[in-house]
Amino acid sequence: MTLLFDGDRRIKSPALAPAGGDRRARDPIELTIGLVNNMPDSALKATDVQIARLLQQAAPWHVRIRLHCFSLPSIARSPMASSHVAQTYTDIDRLDGLDIDGLIVTGAEPVAARLRDESYWPDLAAIVDWARTNTKTTIWSCLAAHAAVLHLDDIERQRLASKCSGVFDCVKVRDDWLTHGIDAPLQVPHSRLNAVNEPLLAERGYDILTRSAEVGVDIFARTMPSRFVFFQGHPEYDALSLQREYMRDIARYLAGQREDYPRPPRSYFSAESEAVLNTFEIRARARRDPTLAAELPGLTLRPDLAAGHAAKLLFRNWIGYLADG
């Protein structure tokens, strides 16, 4: 597999082909995949890398992927992030002329209470309409999943009492090409303030593919005729993504940018680190000082955390579906 950015600028060209006759067993297949990256500036480059690496790891040797990254113009960017977009991204106006096979649309940091009030809502809704008939399959992640079902079927997300953050065991509910070969529960990171109603999704014709007893529906899908796949979680997150988000939220609390002290991600840190974080929380509540952020302790994750395993399985099946024509 050769993984490319627009303009044939290679990220990596790994030697993944098996030796001997297996290399000639199938003709090479080239797929064009688009990534609409709506993540905030602090996570913009990390998301590029996560998705690129994930596609590289999931694709079989005979599949060559050309990855085009896009950013919605209605999402405000800092000068540094804008420069990154200008240098490495494809103009969103070119989307219609690139013959995209599959699309991945990320979430975004929520600003408005209602999705339809977000500055980028018209652009995101237009992407939903375009993807319905111009892709074979599209992945909608987190906030993008909530936005898509709102636009398609007027299904409103519901605000949670507290942030859903952690790694949760998600079990397969029904057979589907996306969940082929998945028997054991998947460890899936979730990080969200909202949720969609599972019975309402089923009533409107969505297939529930995986769910968690703790946090409800995880992956659901619907044929539009493009096969739309919706992630409420973040299987693409690397091992430290939730830790970075948690450290950011603590820093915001210490700086007075949020009133409540953030809860640590569930089923994520080791028992020793959870004890350290409890002690730090007591200090932070007693002395709310931004300089304390520099004293955040080193942390370790739970030893049985299978970081990235769920994403590799899901994206392997997703790429296989695209490659089958």
UniProtKB/Swiss-Prot annotation:
The active site is at residues 142, 234, 236. It is found in: Cytoplasm. This is Homoserine O-succinyltransferase. The record marks 109, 143 as: Important for acyl-CoA specificity. Pathway: Amino-acid biosynthesis; L-methionine biosynthesis via de novo pathway; O-succinyl-L-homoserine from L-homoserine: step 1/1. The keyword Amino-acid biosynthesis applies. Substrate binds at residues 163, 191, 248. Transfers a succinyl group from succinyl-CoA to L-homoserine, forming succinyl-L-homoserine. One of its GO terms (biological process) is methionine biosynthetic process.
